[in-house]
Amino acid sequence: MSKSLQAIRGMNDILPDQSPLWRYFEGTVAGLLDSYGYSQIRTPIVEFTELFKRSIGEVTDIVEKEMYTFQDNKDSLTLRPEGTAACVRAVLEHGIIGNGQVQKLWYVGPMFRHERPQLGRYRQFHQIGVEVFNLAGPDIDAELIMLTWRLWALLGIQDAVTLELNSLGTSEARARYRDALVEFLSQRIDQLDEDSQRRLKSNPLRILDSKNEGTQAALVGAPKLEEYLDEESRVHFEGVKARLDAAGIPFVINTKLVRGLDYYSKTVFEWVTDKLGAQGTVCAGGRYDGLVEQMGGKPTAGVGFAMGIERLLLLIETLGQVPESISRTIDVYLCAFGEQAELAGLKISEQLRDRLPNLRLAVNAGGGNFKNQFKKADKSGALFALILGDDELAKQEIGVKPLRGQGEQQNIAWDALAAHLETAIAQA
């Protein structure tokens, strides 16, 4: 017997009962980004593998272990593991950041990494990301953080997240620090875990955020990144902090925050929570002033962030912040009894859609007696059932029956129905 077909491990279906929360979240974020003047960009989910090697770095965990890569004739292609590289490729390819042209962009979609699936971590996961080009000052760094702070308030999770902040300095400052860190840790290499020993040669800054207790013990007394910061980065970082203070946004300086991607510089930040166990980062980003040039463009300031949708939805549910209204997908359910009533019901329903474009109206399909149709109306979650039979037809009325305890049934004239429903739904 053949094995039943199932979704790939770590790649999940989003079912109808889950979709309202996704739509609510994505709609809330999109509306907020629109209000800040950001424009949406959409890029393919498949890119040439070389794009990610050049942007993320060949000796990162993502490129070495986690990418879904395959051959297409002579080309090596990869399912995107993150969104920044594709966004940079797109703005370069289409020439929309030349001559200092400012672009404030956002995107939403699936990303792919071959990781061990666990709560809040999947092989196909979804992100909303923001990228800004040709703005080099601390004001735009602060704006991105303020934008996310406002989003947390809209979602009801502001009290459950903490902002961690750091500065990585310029590439020259990081190079000086990297040399000092390697020299320090080389004398303690036997105390480092296997991953950290490998990173000592390829990406030593990543050792700072190792979760291994032995490695953390080896880091005691290690040189600190802030001691190697250049003056430009120091002034920039002070500017970011001053703006956050002015906006009343609390933050914690985390000198071990380095981010997992090679292209970051100067400001880096993460929003973390202690409500989701090990998967505590729900949003992360920072500045990447060298990335556009690294990918073949002119020197261009860049800054952005990405937030994990699955983790944020899990946090919203964990905190009980799912709005009650989004669980209802239908406002009104129309029940019609008899062929003439069905025909009249179709006409009435389309007139209602003309008058009330936002009305969520379901018309019974498949016939059925009163008990059967009324049961379906109740099960739909609608606030009201519209009842249309021979008696109502004769009087050109329709019965409006509350389904959620909002009073008694009323018979309403057809020409007054739209106004009645608009008021009744608003009050329900």
Swiss-Prot record:
Subunit-structure text: Homodimer.
Subcellular location: Cytoplasm
Domain of life: Bacteria
Assigned keywords, A-Z: Aminoacyl-tRNA synthetase, ATP-binding, Cytoplasm, Ligase, Nucleotide-binding, Protein biosynthesis
Enzyme Commission code: 6.1.1.21
One Pfam family per UniProt: tRNA-synt_His
CDD domains reported for this sequence: HisRS-like_core, HisRS_anticodon
Name listed for the protein in its UniProt record: Histidine--tRNA ligase
PROSITE patterns reported for this sequence: AA_TRNA_LIGASE_II (PS50862)
Keyword Transcription regulation found: no
Keyword Cytoplasm included in the entry's annotation: yes
Catalysed transformations (reactions): tRNA(His) + L-histidine + ATP = L-histidyl-tRNA(His) + AMP + diphosphate + H(+)
Protein's GO biological process: histidyl-tRNA aminoacylation
